[in-house]
Amino acid sequence: MPTPHSAAPGLSERTPQSVKQQWLAILSVAVGAFALVTSEFLPVGVLNDVASDLGITAGRAGLMVTLPGIMAALAAPLLSVGIGAMDRRYLLTGLTLIMIIANTIVAFASDFNVLLIGRVLLGVSIGGFWATAIALSGRLAPKGVGVAKATSIIMMGVTLATVLGVPVGTWLSGLMGWRMTFLVTALVGVPVLLAQIFLLPPLYPDRAIRVKDLPALFTNAQARVGLIAVLLIGLAHFAAYTYVAPFFKQSAGFDGSTIGSLLLLYGMAGVLGNVFAGFAANRSVRNTLLLVALMIGTSTALFPHFATGITGAAMLIALWGFAFGAFPACASIWMFVVAPKDVERGMPLFVALFQVIIALGSFFGGQIVDQLGSSVLLSLATALVGAGFATVLVLGRNVSNNVVAQPA
């Protein structure tokens, strides 16, 4: 997700708060972001359990990832335009409440159709959150504190959820079952909701985003190169990674405890990858994105051959986790390097694209894994990553960090 330097233009000045209140408000949004993104990716780690419990295939269970992505892709631009002059404080707390309700529905769902209703609601919450989160980070920053620092705290919640949500979900599912895992995630949202109600200041806009603002990034040639690369690499990742747990169970024969440990290793490596990207991509985003694509492609290419043994699986899942941990930062910094003035206006459609990638990747990955198997899926993912690598190498050859995306 993009990370801004400053508050979105057109937002009114914040009301006076103590520095402590401001930091607590930022923390409440960060923890909310962690819970929200964890909820989105949680099914990846529990697909086997859900499929077995409800008597469905792993591919069909993958709709738990696909549907929220579709709804979030629709909600991001629609809400960003439709909320108009509404106080963003009420929007954010309302979206947190929707997340709590959605996870509770999943936890107590009597069948798969009811479960999917909860996941659709979650998608609305995800899309709405990202339609406003960037502007919120700028508004909440204490005086004298760089907006990028405040934003980085919120984005750390997102990054940790992206790379740790799956392994933590798998671990909790092994301890107490997948239903209780979703219920725990819902309960985490309750103190977050209360904190937001009492700590967030009024966030009235002076000027809302207009429909004509949305395609800002798509009209910039070098931004389009980045968007194409993000599309190809992201599709490959979400198509393949969504079904890593079934691969480990069916092809490698690992038990649930081993799978959980491997996914935790992925998450730990992802945190390191995120830190690496913060340094490397701010120096050369093109070279860093090329390296990320190379690492993901290497992982997916070697997975069918070497990930059936514990040593090979550990090495490849760690490499994959490190690479994807760096991927969101690379995507964000690319946009700031090539189109710094367009990121704010183009953010809702950027969010929509990312959610479409998640939805399409998990959907087509499910179809392929059900019909053709995991090895074919991983081979196709490798080809997509290769296409993304070539896009950056050839079409992005003129991209350089002459404009610093984010001050250190």
Q: Residues of each region from the PLM?
A:
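Paired small-residue
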Residues: A102-I105, N113-L122, T311-L319
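Helix-to-loop junctions at the C-terminal end of transmembrane segments
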Residues: A75-R88, G273-V285, V369-D370
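Cytoplasmic helix-loop-helix junction between adjacent transmembrane helices
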Residues: G118-G157
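A late C-terminal transmembrane helix in Major Facilitator Superfamily
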Residues: V338-S374, L380-A381
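Conserved MFS/SLC helix-loop-helix module at the cytosolic interface between two early adjacent transmembrane helices
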Residues: L74-N113
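Helix-loop-helix hairpin linking two adjacent transmembrane segments in secondary transporters
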Residues: S110-V114, K143-L200, F247, D255
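Helix-breaking motifs and short loop linkers at transmembrane-helix boundaries and internal kinks
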Residues: G55, D87, F108-V114, G253, ...
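C-terminal transmembrane helical hairpin of 12-TM major facilitator-type secondary transporters
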Residues: N287-A331
